[in-house]
Amino acid sequence: AKDVMAVNYFALDERFGTVRPAYYVLSDPMFFRDSVCRDRVAELYRTLAEKVTWPMNLYVQYYNPERFDYRAALPNPNIRIVRFHTQVYRGFRGVEFWLYRHGLGSANFGTVVQVCEYVALLLGYKTLELYGVDHTLLDGLSVDDENRLCRADRHYYDDAPAVPKPIFQKVPHRPYT
């Protein structure tokens, strides 16, 4: 049997209970900060809390400025919450790599897939098989009539056509222009 690592909203997929991932990664700030996705995020946490009947490690960012309480959102004893660092170090290369190898820093990852690869390497995995990974980070980028950078974000679990939405810098929303 192979260990499986899942990300984002996979728990809402009907195959979640069959796949039974040993590891789960949430790295997008929408999972620990207030966002327009709050209802869907709440549904994800409810689903994880109710459906995980096996031991699973949930990897979340150590950075958590609003002090989101993962344990309160996930009162499931089968889920072990593990924090990973996202602090970017710029300096001596030897120190940088030492921090990376010990999980005390990261390389400013742009996608949850990169975070998964990093976590898997920290766990000691030498071979990784990636399934369903979409490497189209730049696809769907556009500029709207108000000169805001927008993205039509597509995922396998979304049936509706992707509509370009402004990409915001921070909470509160301030669009890239």
Label each PLM-derived region with a short phrase.
Residues A1-T177:
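Metal-ion/cofactor- or nucleotide/acyl-coenzyme-handling active-site neighborhoods
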